[in-house]
Regions:
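A hydrophobic, multi-pass inner-membrane permease signature
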Residues: 1-223
Length: 223
């Protein structure tokens, strides 16, 4: 199975999309969550706007038209930027930031801290658990994504993620095996491909759980 260069290419592409999408989504969630948690005049409108997008989705065709208008079709960016975050993740991080004791923020403001210092030095250490929850969910969604690749980079096989190769191989297992060996087992190939696609994320899950448990119990001490 791993002698097929398409599987290796799929792994590399998927890792790129997972890392890029997760990091970009984490940054967007942190900044959006912080802004939404602050008491500003537009806070209510922005929260309502985020909630509205969770109930009404533009759909596949309008989304594709936007991606095409931005010139991202046929590129890796079409599989990294779209879907790296959503309104639910932003609201979760916002709620976590809003629960930080205001006395910490007031103490930082008295010491002359700006928004970036408050966000990363005061709020982030106490809310990293929830932020990591959104990051892990983003990573899992990026790892399992194949439909986006099938419409954004259908002819650019060098950009195909692992899951799209898995779909192609399992759907055409008979032809794939006939080309490789005359003594083939279609079911065995399908099982092997599925295990190869899911094993990495399953092995990483216990590590993520430990990080989440540690992050959830973090607190703060004013100094």
């Amino acid at each position: 199975l791993f002698q097929d260069s398409s599987i290796i290419s799929g792994y590399v592409n998927t890792i790129i999309y997972v890392i890029g999408g997760t990091l970009l989504g984490l940054v967007m969630n942190i900044f959006a969550g912080y802004i939404l948690s602050r008491a500003t005049k537009l806070r209510g409108f922005m929260i309502l706007y985020c909630v509205f997008t969770t109930m009404f989705n533009g759909g596949t065709v309008p989304t594709y038209m936007v991606i095409r208008a931005l010139g991202m079709t046929g590129t890796r960016w079409s599989l990294i930027i779209p879907g790296c975050t959503n309104a639910v993740f932003m609201l979760l991080v916002m709620n976590s930031f809003a629960q930080v004791d205001k006395s910490y923020v007031e103490a930082a403001e008295i010491d002359g801290a700006g928004h970036l210092a408050i966000m990363f030095k005061v709020m982030w250490p106490q809310c990293k658990g929830m932020a990591l929850v959104t990051a892990i969910n983003t990573a899992i969604m990026k790892w399992n994504a194949w439909f986006e690749a099938s419409i954004y980079v259908p002819n650019n096989t060098e950009y195909w993620p692992l899951q799209l190769w898995v779909k192609k191989i399992t759907a055409n297992a008979t032809d794939y095996l006939k080309a490789a060996t005359p003594n083939y087992d279609k079911g065995l190939l399908q099982y092997c491909v599925i295990v190869a696609a899911t094993l990495p994320i399953l092995l990483a899950f216990p590590f993520f759980i430990k990080k989440l448990e540690k992050g959830m119990v973090l607190g703060g001490v004013k100094g």
